[in-house]
Regions:
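S-adenosylmethionine/decaboxylated-SAM
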Residues: 3-19, 25-225
Length: 225
């Protein structure tokens, strides 16, 4: 078994609309490949499915070897603050003119269908806090790449970080320890609290991606310390 992206899916990932650099996507794929045999993975922040292809590729490989891997990906598909009209990361082609709001769900659906990953990647459409409040399943891998404001980042940490199983991995995107490189909330509201809780230790870092391993506690119980 190789642990790099299968060439056909790498092509889809590179072509997909979104915000996942190829090297960080490969890292995401590697951690998903390690973890998916042990339980479902969950991503917060689907957008148009770019990172979901890296995760789904790992699921396809695990399932080809007899596994039953699945990746859930949560998004209300209305965009983050920085995706709205007038902001830096706005794309007018993902606006639904009828409702006058962003809607990345159709693009996501086309992207995942074209990649052939509809069986592996399951979209959960809704607010992260709402889905988290009703979530009950331990995760082999959690990937947070959702809203980058202070409150959304804090909510994502509180809602999801405790669902990682012991030995499981927690990947966080857009972590910028140096404020000159980017916004602070994923660093201050997710990355640091995860380490300070004592439940996580850092195992990998690449670009703005950080990968932590759960070293103590029980999935679903509040994070200690
Ligand atoms: N992982 C994607 C990029 C995600 S961009 C990629 O690889 O390209 C961040 C996404 O988080 C946006 O699509 C936005 O709609 C979503 N988001 C922001 N805040 C959210 C919230 N509170 N609940 C659900 N989704 C949210
Ligand atoms: Mg990101």
């Amino acid at each position: 078994m190789t642990d790099t992206m299968p060439p056909d899916l790498l092509e889809h990932a590179l072509a997909a609309k979104g915000f996942m650099p190829p090297d960080e996507g490969e890292l995401l794929h590697r951690v998903a490949r390690e973890r998916l045999p042990h339980g479902p993975a969950l991503e917060v922040g689907t957008y148009c499915g770019k990172s979901a292809i890296y995760l789904g590729a790992a699921a396809r490989q695990v399932n080809a070897a007899g596994g039953s891997a699945v990746v859930f990906t949560v998004d209300h598909h209305r965009g983050s603050e920085e995706n709205q009209a007038g902001w830096e990361h706005h794309d007018p082609t993902v606006v639904d003119p009828e409702v006058g709001m962003m809607d990345t769900l159709p693009t996501f659906r086309r992207t995942i269908a074209a990649a052939g990953l509809e069986d592996q990647v399951v979209a959960v459409v809704g607010r992260s806090t709402t889905v988290a409040a009703h979530w009950r399943t331990p995760l082999s891998l959690l990937f947070i790449d959702g809203g980058h404001g202070e409150q959304p980042a804090r909510d994502d940490f509180r809602g999801w970080a405790h669902w990682v199983m012991p030995g499981g991995l927690f990947a966080i995107h857009d972590v910028f320890p140096d404020p000159a490189d980017g916004g602070r909330p994923p660093y201050e509201q997710i990355y640091l609290p995860a380490l300070e809780s004592g439940a996580y230790e850092e195992v990998d870092a690449l670009g703005s991606m950080r990968v932590l391993r759960r070293v103590s506690g029980t999935a679903g119980d509040p994070l200690g310390g």
